[in-house]
Swiss-Prot record:
Function in brief: Has a role in controlling mitotic cell cycle progression at the G2/M transition phase.
Protein keywords: Cell cycle, Cell division, Mitosis
CC annotations in GO: cytosol; nucleus
The UniProt record lists the keyword Signal: no
Family membership: To yeast SPO12.
Protein name: Mitosis-specific protein spo12
Alphabetized Pfam families for the sequence: Spo12
GO BP terms, alphabetized: cell division
Originating gene: spo12
């Protein structure tokens, strides 16, 4: 009988079901995030100081604008160049 009890214990331990991992966590996560989303009107808030610029920022903007104005125009692709040459010939 001891062997049958040991066999039954071994079989019962093998037959134990393994619970699957929780797959619902993704849907729960989405539900939680949806509750915490900002309202759309809150994203369009403008501060009264948005139009103000510090002297340092103004200087940096002027410096950047100066270099952007001096830059070379972008190189046109070969197809655009050929089209412009053909239109000039006509």
């Amino acid at each position: 009988m001891s062997e049958t009890q040991a066999d039954s214990i071994a079989k019962s331990s093998v037959e134990t079901t393994i619970q699957p991992l929780h797959q619902e966590s993704a849907t729960l996560r989405q539900q939680v995030l949806q509750k915490h989303e900002l309202p759309k009107h809150a994203l369009n808030v403008a501060s009264p100081t948005d139009s103000l610029m510090s002297p340092c920022t103004a200087k940096l903007q002027a410096h950047k604008k100066k270099y952007y104005m001096k830059r070379k125009p972008p190189v046109m692709s070969l197809q655009n160049t050929l089209q412009s040459v053909q239109t000039e010939k006509e």
